[in-house]
Amino acid sequence: ALTLLTVSDSLITKESLSSLERQTTFNTMVKLALEMACELQK
């Protein structure tokens, strides 16, 4: 089993991503996850 997590808001430092940053980084995470899943299927 493999888990890939992305954090957009920190409860400790109160930092958060803008909507655009969240969209961009989540898209990157999804692409990476799909690439990894394809590699694991080989």
UniProtKB/Swiss-Prot annotation:
The record marks 22 as: Important for catalytic activity. Its EC number is 2.4.2.1. InterPro entries: Nucleoside_phosphorylase_sf. Signal peptide: none annotated. A purine D-ribonucleoside binds at residues 8-9. It catalyses: a purine D-ribonucleoside + phosphate = a purine nucleobase + alpha-D-ribose 1-phosphate; a purine 2'-deoxy-D-ribonucleoside + phosphate = a purine nucleobase + 2-deoxy-alpha-D-ribose 1-phosphate. GO terms for biological process: nucleoside metabolic process. Keywords: Glycosyltransferase, Transferase. Belongs to the PNP/UDP phosphorylase family. Catalyzes the reversible phosphorolytic breakdown of the N-glycosidic bond in the beta-(deoxy)ribonucleoside molecules, with the formation of the corresponding free purine bases and pentose-1-phosphate. Homohexamer; trimer of homodimers. This is Purine nucleoside phosphorylase DeoD-type. It comes from Mycoplasmoides pirum (Mycoplasma pirum).
